[in-house]
Amino acid sequence: MLLMNLQLFATKKGVGSSKNGRDSEAKRLGVKCADGQFVLAGSILVRQRGTKIHPGQNVGRGGDDTLFSKVDGVVRYERVGKNKKRASVYPIDVEEVIAAE
């Protein structure tokens, strides 16, 4: 009786799956209105996570910590103390803005 020791090899290489390859969408956070810019009531000033910038005069804070203007006016970003920032909106007449331009 003839004994054969036969070794079979794979004809196709097994391909492993990568555990990377995913990423979340960017949230587009940051300052939306510059210092000295004229804004209308309801305009978003800053999109942020947490209170990196605190609400000041005539500025409201949304549920996701977004800062928005409560009145028409000019945006001002101010330092409060050593490492705290505050956004305020100071109301001015629209006629003054048009005359200045």
Curated annotation (Swiss-Prot):
GO terms for biological process: translation. Gene3D superfamilies: 2.40.50.100. InterPro entries: Ribosomal_bL27, Ribosomal_bL27_CS. The N-terminus is cleaved by ribosomal processing cysteine protease Prp. Keywords: Ribonucleoprotein, Ribosomal protein. It comes from the Bacteria. GO terms for molecular function: structural constituent of ribosome. PROSITE patterns: RIBOSOMAL_L27. Residues 1-9 form a propeptide. It holds the Pfam family Ribosomal_L27. GO terms for cellular component: cytosolic large ribosomal subunit. Belongs to the bacterial ribosomal protein bL27 family. This is Large ribosomal subunit protein bL27. It comes from Clostridium tetani (strain Massachusetts / E88). The lineage of its organism: Bacteria, Bacillati, Bacillota, Clostridia, Eubacteriales.
